């Protein structure tokens, strides 16, 4: 490939769909045969039917009420309007709308960046809400919420409802485990990697004052974007690329050093894939790279509603540049319905790692994040979500946008089919041996 600035390109949002689509198109045109998976699009009808039944159950035909995919819904899990209660509390205290938007961004950034897969056994119990227990993404969301409202993330003694970089850099393992209720009896996947990510987030916030202000707050992103916006009849208009670039530039340093890099600069959630090289017809390093930027995309999706509805109330252009999220619920949906099947060699390799990690009874394959099986799975997941959207819209006779499809359908359907097929764990059909910074 020939691009003027490879680092800039691979960190861009446009690179995600472009690089992964090459893999999807190659597998589709190769009779569904990838290096690690077999893809059978003929089985997509079953996915569509299952997904549409969930939408009908949860929303009836009121499709316009489906919110875009975002962290807001996780923070409100258990039918508790935690976010709205905070907003009401702040408004009642006379806090202006722009500062409310900063506080929401503070909370959402922290909450999203701790949202890598929690594993099958960890739970968070809310003593403040009658000892309700939440697991997985919702548990991590509620844990992050209580750390925020208790002031554990703020260095401002006069305002506990903030996230400050300096405070995050000082977070200890004991404080992390206490905040997330981690113990030998309640283990959380990737604890050390997750804490390091938080500490690195603190460094990023503290060393990027142009974006995060003198306080090193995620919420100062609001003011940075306002400085970049154009005005249209009094409305602040910003392009998704500006939001994206601020997140990528601001948070590049949080990623582990071992990730794919060019000239020593890490690219974030980007990986080398043999299938991509084959699809490109080239063995060159740049032609083998695919990008996902899943946590940044999840963050971007989650920030759009606060940015649009509070404070400066931005109008955000080109939101459709984002892709579906390449994580285990969306990907698991296609695997559990047989649209994707691991090749024999990949399955045996994954099962060997499962057994090496001490589980000799499980038939669930396990892979590390850089394994070609995981990387190809994620590429195909993005392509399949794009393929799925028009099929669902045709059946519903309504034009959902991709973030609505993920929120009401694919992510939820992936979780529900997992619970049906694996009721003991409700876990995904493929396990990731994770450091707490992927998925």
UniProtKB/Swiss-Prot annotation:
Superkingdom is Eukaryota
Q: Which positions are tagged coiled coil?
A: none
- State the InterPro entries in the record: DUF1688
Transmembrane annotation, as ranges: none
One family from Pfam that matches here is DUF1688
State its role. Involved in uracil catabolism.
What family is it from? Belongs to the URC4/urg3 family.
What is this protein's record name?
Answer: Uracil catabolism protein 4
Q: What organism does the UniProt record list as the source? A: Lachancea kluyveri
